[in-house]
């Protein structure tokens, strides 16, 4: 996907097209008032107050029609500068523009004129509205003014604009592809998860089939961790505010946490992360240097108060389950343990055929003594240790100043999904700070107490986000071991007793041998039931008729294919079990 904000040519053009859209809206809705209309990575948008009118598909069509008129008229676009007082007078009837103007420094303010429309704007813009003719309004939504839930709702219209119709057409094709890959659409078609505003925004619920996928991911990563000596625990979803004051999260992360709850005179909070709980588990008993490293893992439920505008299905929610672990090590073990984590990340990526990723070493900003723990020696030691491992492993990475956690540097592995923007999937963070805050110690070789170092790491990140990622990469065509339903039996004729008996016999046979199988006996035509299985991305479709009953065989077809293969049921089972055991994965 093109980045409209980063591309200077597209940035200017889309900025101008936002004004064309605003002009068209003003023609159709004279009462309209406008907040901001910036260019973003995905194109442009404008936040609009239409009073009692609402935006719907019919309104979008009418706005596009009016925009075409504005472009066809080919009005010159002029920039002029006026004083702040003149701007206040010009926009005196628009409270949104007045709010913007009041926030500006004294001095001249730029406005842009195009025909009968004038807007407050820094620019730059193209010089004529006719240059904006290759546009498309792509979506609309309701948003809170200034992103504050305490404010009223405005209507946001998104669009894109290109220099040529060919570029626009190509982009619209990509948008359609993105819609087909959107994990929210796939999740609905496959009955994986749901959400409801009565439960709460950003609080998705996994349905039986979605939870099956979730459990398979959990089993997969926990098995890999157990082989490496991880010890799995379970800790509560809440903690006292004092716990998070001790860890420093209350000072550094409070804005991302849910409000505290008062219970019997004590303040509790939903946890945003699991480190404090795991620190307390380590502190539960005395440790010797011979015990280290100790690797504590958990599939943990976490809660973060994400802004409503950033919520996106199971990719980004206010509740999620983290594939979390904390490694308690001696200073001498830092490099070997960090190296093992990096190997685990890329071994996992190999299993899932994840190849499009970028490694980022996130470092502190030495000048920011407020955000970051103020210990230069600690930071230099930690950052150099991570650099050395990455260099020794020959891993390409970039460094980003000011992106570290408040307690230490980290390695983020960012993926570029099939749709949308890059985000972090896996992370490993080095921490000299938290063990000191919790007074964690171990008895060293010389009999003295020493403070361990902690590696925070998440391989799959959150299971929710990881599931969203693979759903979009595969368009829902999950590998057999991960598919919620691995095979579906469809008897050709539901009213045939002998056929129904064989169908249920096969159902029991496969189920008893560990295959996730179901039967579709609905009173629908065969073609309808086959199409339903295709939509739900069932990997193996079993079509049974009289011949299969007579021969004790299975006729199956793979998802997306028309060819049917007939084999003995024992051979079919062996084929499925082999594919599951080898964890054959998908091709992107």
Question: Where are each of the predicted segments found?
Answer:
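NTP/phosphate- and nucleic-acid-binding module
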Residues: 1-35, 39-41, 47-588
């Amino acid at each position: 996907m093109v980045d409209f904000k980063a591309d200077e040519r597209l940035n200017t053009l889309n900025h101008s097209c936002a004004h064309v859209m605003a002009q068209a809206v003003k023609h159709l809705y004279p009462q309209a008032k406008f907040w901001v209309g910036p260019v973003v990575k995905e194109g442009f948008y404008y936040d609009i107050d239409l009073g009692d009118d609402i935006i719907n598909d019919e309104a979008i069509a009418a706005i596009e029609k009016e925009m075409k008129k504005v472009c066809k008229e080919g009005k010159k676009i002029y920039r002029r500068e006026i004083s702040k007082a003149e701007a206040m007078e010009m926009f005196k009837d628009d409270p949104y523009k007045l709010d913007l103007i009041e926030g500006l420094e004294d001095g001249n303010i730029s406005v842009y004129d195009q025909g009968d429309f004038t807007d407050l704007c820094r620019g730059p813009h193209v010089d004529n509205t006719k240059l904006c003719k290759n546009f498309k309004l792509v979506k609309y939504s309701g948003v809170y003014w200034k992103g504050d839930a305490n404010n009223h709702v405005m209507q946001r219209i998104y669009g894109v604009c290109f220099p040529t119709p060919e570029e626009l057409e190509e982009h619209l094709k990509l948008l359609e592809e993105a819609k087909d890959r959107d994990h929210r659409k796939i999740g609905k078609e496959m009955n994986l998860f749901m959400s409801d505003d009565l439960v709460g925004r950003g609080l998705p619920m996994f349905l039986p089939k979605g939870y099956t996928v979730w459990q398979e991911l959990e089993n997969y990563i926990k098995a890999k961790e157990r082989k490496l000596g991880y010890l799995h625990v379970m800790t509560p979803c809440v903690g006292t505010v004092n716990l998070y004051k001790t860890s420093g999260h209350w000072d550094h992360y409070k804005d991302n946490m849910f409000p505290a709850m008062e219970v019997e005179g004590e303040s509790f909070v939903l946890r945003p992360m699991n480190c404090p709980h795991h620190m307390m588990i380590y502190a539960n008993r005395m440790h010797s240097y011979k015990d280290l490293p100790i690797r504590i893992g958990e599939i943990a439920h976490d809660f973060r108060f994400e802004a409503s505008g950033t919520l996106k299905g199971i990719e980004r929610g206010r509740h999620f389950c983290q594939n979390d672990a904390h490694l308690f090590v001696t200073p001498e073990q830092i490099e070997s343990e960090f190296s093992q984590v990096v190997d685990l990340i890329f071994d996992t990526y190999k299993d899932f055929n994840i190849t499009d990723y970028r490694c980022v070493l996130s470092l502190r900003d030495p000048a920011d003594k407020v955000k970051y723990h103020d210990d230069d020696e600690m930071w230099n030691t930690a950052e150099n240790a991570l650099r050395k491992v990455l260099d020794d492993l020959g891993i390409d990475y970039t460094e980003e100043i000011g992106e570290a956690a408040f307690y230490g540097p980290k390695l983020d592995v960012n993926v570029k999904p099939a749709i949308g923007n890059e985000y972090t999937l896996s992370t490993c963070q080095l921490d000299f700070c938290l063990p000191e805050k919790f007074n964690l110690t171990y008895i060293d070789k010389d009999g003295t107490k020493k403070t361990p170092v902690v590696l925070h790491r998440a391989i799959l990140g959150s299971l929710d986000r990881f599931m969203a990622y693979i759903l979009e990469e595969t368009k829902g065509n999950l590998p057999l071991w991960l598919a919620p339903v691995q095979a579906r039996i469809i008897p050709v004729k539901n009213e045939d007793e002998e056929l129904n008996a064989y169908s249920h016999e096969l159902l029991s046979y496969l189920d008893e041998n560990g295959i996730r199988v179901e039967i579709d006996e609905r009173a629908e035509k065969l073609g309808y039931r086959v199409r339903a299985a295709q939509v739900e991305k069932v990997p193996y479709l079993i079509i049974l008729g009289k011949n299969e009953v007579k021969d004790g065989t299975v006729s199956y077809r793979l998802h997306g294919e028309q060819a049917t293969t007939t084999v003995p049921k024992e051979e079919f089972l062996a084929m499925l079990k082999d594919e599951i055991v080898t964890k054959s994965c998908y091709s992107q």
